[in-house]
Structure formats: structure tokens, C-alpha cells
């Protein structure tokens, strides 16, 4: 057996729900703890325990991430009315991801995991496109309402220093009314977004593009453009030049067109709503939503998780004692991306190499023909073309990754 790697500082381990919790347990037992001497602070974010603690456990988990600097999160249920009934919940608890984002702030980076033999819907995407989504403000913190009849819509800003208010005329509504929206962002949050994107690009050694619609929202989107440009010129241009990469602002429509015909290999900084939409479009373009990592990077902490949900349909089969073939790759990458950040904070080169070896083992397994059913369907073109011998079940795939990992670690 390979000697365990000592990890000197702990991480927060956030448990989740349903089938992803099942594979989380397998990942811990077969891919993490046999190889690492690692201390974890565990927080049960399963829906039933969140309900039992009135969601206090989510707040505790977010604060632990702040303190420990690293959180590794399993997918969780965000309850709707049907889930409230199913679990007999006290109330419709908020998304744990939203609570964590509101506590930590930061930027959400979503990156596809590229396997050469998994066909891409956008065939020219040979390298990853990372979406950096500004996870604060805009439509997600907006005030919107229905206007019932004729009237004047105004915006008023009242300075805290007691100086004269500024009033802006927005629209005169006709008698049949309409809808209205007021939204905002802050310089501090935009600056944090910019720093996160520049640092992420430098780390990847990939160019960075910011997309806005500053031709229409001259002041609102213009503020994003100006802040990014100021920080780039002052602090990053020389570093980017040295690394052989660049930063550019592009209009969102131009950027979408460029992305569709590019080969990938860049970081795309998006405002909150744009990032929400484009990250799913990019994920599907690479062929599988099950091959997408997600990290929330704030000024001094990181939370990593899979970009998919709790895989309820597979969990129902698991509950009946039936065989499942659930893709665990994104959940494994949640562990590797979290531990990679821990390794960089601690200057732990052995841990960093372990993370890279585990990621390579996942990809090598798929590229050697060892994969779960969802990927076999992608490779074969349709479910009708897939035989049982074409794929592994949930545990068999993780066992295969463990086998490849041992050989890679032995060779280090």
C-alpha cells in the first residue's frame, strides 16, 4: 500500500443528499482516506438534518469554511413544495449554496472536465472554457414588482452624509401598467470579482475575457469594464505579458459568437445572470453536465462541489436495491479541487501531486473505455447502442479509478 500523505491542516467536509451522498461515502472510503492522513470537520447538510437544526448547520458550515479556508461540498437538495411534503419539512429552506455564497462572497468558477473520447456538441472545443460568474447582486438581489396602473416610476438615491438626494425619472406607465425592476452592485464586490478572475487566469495561464453590454448600460456595465481595466493596467498587465496571456473586454453578443467558434482554453468573466446562463450552455456544449466542476473562490477561501444535482432517479433505484451506474467524476473533482487549494495554502507538494494523479486517473479510466452509463451513451450516440458490457456500475468505476491511482502514486 502507498504511504499516506500527511495533510497538516483540516478542511470542511459538507455532506449532501440522495445518490450523491452514496457516492460521496464511496469516494471518501476508496479514494481519499486510504491515501491521505487528513482531518476533516464534517457538517451534515442533508435535508433532514438541515430541517432538524432549522438550517443552522448550513450557517455553521459556511463559518467553518471561512475559518478553515477550504470547503468540499456534496450536492444538496434545495426543497420545493413537493420536497417539503416528501420530507415533512418545517419550511422551504433556502439553497445551501446561496447561504454559503452570501456568507463568503466571491466568484463562482465552472470548468468542464474534458475526456477525448466523449463527443462534444461544439466539436471545436478541444480545451476547457472556464466561466467565472460574479456571484453577487444584479437580478439576484433586485427588487421587482408589478405596476397596476398609470403612474410615474422614479429612482431616488439618498446619500448617508445628508447631502441632497439624487432623483431619476425612469418611466411614465400607461393605464394598463407593467413591471419594474431596481437592481444594484457595489464597487467592492466588482473589485473582488476582478481580482479573483485575474488570479485564476494567471494560475491557469489562460487569457481572460470580460463580457458586458456596456453599449446599452453605459454606467452600470461600464463600471464593470472600467474597474477591470484599471486593475489590469495597474497590477496585472506585466504579469500577464510575462505569462504570455492577455485580458480583453468584449460585448456579450460578440463574446458568445467568439466562444462558439473558438477551441477553448480561456477564462470568461460573466456578470451574475450571464454566468448563470452561459455556464449551463458551456457545460452542455462539452457533452455532459456530469463532467463539470464548480468552485466558489473568495478573497481567502474556496468551496468546491460538483455542478450537478443529487441524482434522485438513481437514488430511487439504489433504495430498491437495484444496480446503479452513477457518474462520480464531478464529485471526485470537488475533492481534488478543494484539496489542491489546501495544498497551495500549505505548500504541500505531495498533496498537490496526489490531486493531479487522482484527476488523471478519472480521465484515463474513461479514455481507456471504463466509464459509467451516461458517458457510454454519449460515446455510443444513443441508449439503444449501449450494452451492459459497455459501462461500469457506480462502485466498479470508483474501484477502477482507485486501481489507476495506486499505480500513479507508486510511480511518483
Curated annotation (Swiss-Prot):
Cofactor note: Binds 1 Mg(2+) or Mn(2+) ion per subunit.
Gene that produces this protein: idhC
Sequence positions that bind substrate: 78, 95-101, 110, 133
Cofactor: Mg(2+); Mn(2+)
Top EC category: oxidoreductase
Family matches, as NCBIfam families: nadp_idh_euk (TIGR00127), PRK08299.1 (NF006156)
Keyword entries, A-Z: Cytoplasm, Glyoxylate bypass, Magnesium, Manganese, Metal-binding, NADP, Oxidoreductase, Tricarboxylic acid cycle
Signal sequence residues: none
Protein name (database record): Isocitrate dehydrogenase [NADP] cytoplasmic
Any Gene Ontology biological process: tricarboxylic acid cycle
Origin species: Dictyostelium discoideum
Residues reported in the UniProt entry to bind NADP(+): 76-78, 83, 261, 309-314, 327
Family the UniProt entry places it in: Belongs to the isocitrate and isopropylmalate dehydrogenases family.
Any one of the GO CC terms: phagocytic vesicle
Annotated binding of Mn(2+), by residue: 253, 276
Subunit comment: Homodimer.
E.C. number: 1.1.1.42
Site (Critical for catalysis): 140, 213
Amino acid at each position: 500500500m502507498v504511504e499516506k500523505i500527511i495533510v497538516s491542516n483540516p478542511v470542511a467536509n459538507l455532506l449532501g443528499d440522495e445518490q450523491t451522498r452514496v457516492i460521496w461515502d464511496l469516494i471518501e472510503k476508496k479514494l481519499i482516506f486510504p491515501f491521505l492522513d487528513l482531518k476533516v470537520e464534517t457538517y451534515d447538510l442533508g435535508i433532514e438534518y438541515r430541517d432538524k437544526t432549522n438550517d443552522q448547520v448550513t450557517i455553521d458550515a459556511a463559518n467553518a469554511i471561512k475559518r478553515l479556508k477550504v470547503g468540499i461540498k456534496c450536492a444538496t437538495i434545495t426543497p420545493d413544495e413537493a420536497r417539503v411534503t416528501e420530507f415533512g419539512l418545517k419550511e422551504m429552506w433556502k439553497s445551501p449554496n446561496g447561504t454559503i455564497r452570501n456568507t463568503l462572497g466571491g466568484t463562482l468558477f465552472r470548468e468542464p472536465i474534458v475526456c477525448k473520447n466523449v463527443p462534444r456538441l461544439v466539436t471545436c472545443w478541444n480545451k476547457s472554457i472556464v466561466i467565472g460568474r460574479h456571484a453577487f447582486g444584479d437580478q439576484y438581489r433586485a427588487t421587482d414588482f408589478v405596476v397596476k396602473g398609470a403612474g410615474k416610476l422614479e429612482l431616488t438615491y439618498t446619500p448617508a452624509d445628508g447631502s441632497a438626494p439624487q432623483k431619476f425619472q425612469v418611466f411614465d406607465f400607461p393605464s394598463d401598467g407593467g413591471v419594474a425592476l431596481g437592481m444594484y452592485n457595489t464597487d467592492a464586490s466588482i473589485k473582488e470579482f476582478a481580482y479573483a478572475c485575474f488570479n485564476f487566469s494567471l494560475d491557469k495561464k489562460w487569457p481572460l475575457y470580460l463580457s458586458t453590454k456596456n453599449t446599452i448600460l453605459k454606467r452600470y456595465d461600464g463600471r464593470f469594464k472600467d474597474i477591470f481595466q484599471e486593475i489590469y493596467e495597474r497590477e496585472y498587465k506585466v504579469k500577464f505579458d510575462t505569462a504570455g496571456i492577455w485580458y480583453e473586454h468584449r460585448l456579450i453578443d460578440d463574446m458568445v459568437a467568439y466562444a462558439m467558434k473558438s477551441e477553448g482554453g480561456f477564462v470568461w468573466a460573466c456578470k451574475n445572470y450571464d454566468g448563470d446562463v452561459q455556464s449551463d450552455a458551456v457545460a452542455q456544449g462539452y457533452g455532459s453536465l456530469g463532467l463539470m466542476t464548480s468552485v466558489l473562490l473568495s478573497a481567502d477561501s474556496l468551496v468546491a462541489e460538483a455542478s450537478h444535482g443529487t441524482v434522485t432517479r438513481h437514488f430511487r433505484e439504489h433504495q430498491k436495491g437495484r444496480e446503479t451506474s452513477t457518474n462520480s467524476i464531478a464529485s471526485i473533482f470537488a475533492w481534488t479541487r478543494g484539496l489542491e487549494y489546501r495544498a497551495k495554502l500549505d505548500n504541500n507538494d505531495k498533496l498537490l501531486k496526489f490531486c493531479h494523479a487522482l484527476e488523471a486517473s478519472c480521465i484515463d479510466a474513461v479514455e481507456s473505455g471504463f466509464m459509467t452509463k451516461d458517458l457510454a451513451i454519449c460515446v455510443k450516440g444513443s441508449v439503444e447502442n449501449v450494452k451492459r458490457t459497455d459501462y461500469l456500475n457506480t462502485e466498479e468505476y470508483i474501484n477502477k479509478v482507485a486501481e489507476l491511482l495506486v499505480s500513479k502514486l507508486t510511480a511518483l
